[in-house]
Amino acid sequence: MLTVAGANARNLGVSGNPVFAAVQFEYTTKDLAGNDMYGRLPSPIAILTLDQNPQTGELKLVKYHNVDMSKVYGLWITCGASLSPWGTHLSSEEYEPDAFKARTDEQFKAFSKNLYSDETKANPYHYGHLPEIVVNAEGTGVAKKHFNLGRISHELIQVMPDQRTALMGDDFTNGGLFMFVADKVKDLSAGNLYVAKVTQKSAVGGAAADSEFSVSWIHLGYATSAEIEALANLVVPTDSMDVQ
């Protein structure tokens, strides 16, 4: 939960303290027949306006606002999120879709159809990125998607106190550990991306509690989100690799 500067309790219909929460849904999507729709529907994120009793802390829901995701191509599978030091909701798109299989994968085809009414319209390179939601004082939210933080299985990004450095796990088997260093504080739209190289220093086969390793960082490149988004709009999988 968070407070937002400029939030007016009377205008919001709140009698106590106005507080807000950004909520997202991962495993709670079913169709009318009760069938699991995981990954087959675009993921929503909503802003809750809550009325907090200043004496007891009790919360009451006043408003539910669905954030418009049309300008960020909808959201793929959202997972763990964090609150940025500057008060925004840092979400995730995990299990980035395989671009080579996008036209045959039933899950991605269903996602595309439910998003665009067209099984072939969704671009797999638009997903697997880091969405950020700015919560407004009137209880609404605005979405942007950062394409320059790596196309990985994002989950639970953590921004360091310098408000420029972010550590990111890759929630996937044999995934990596990534670091992003932004050009400016409170702004993830441009910066340098790194991946961790972990070197074991303790004996092979030893107890996990006795393990020791060193970490160095390999520079992957510098980019703005706009530059990577432009590439995502143009490239196809065979531009970078062949699969036999």
Q: What is each of the regions a protein language model found here?
A:
Residues M1-Q244:
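Conserved small-residue
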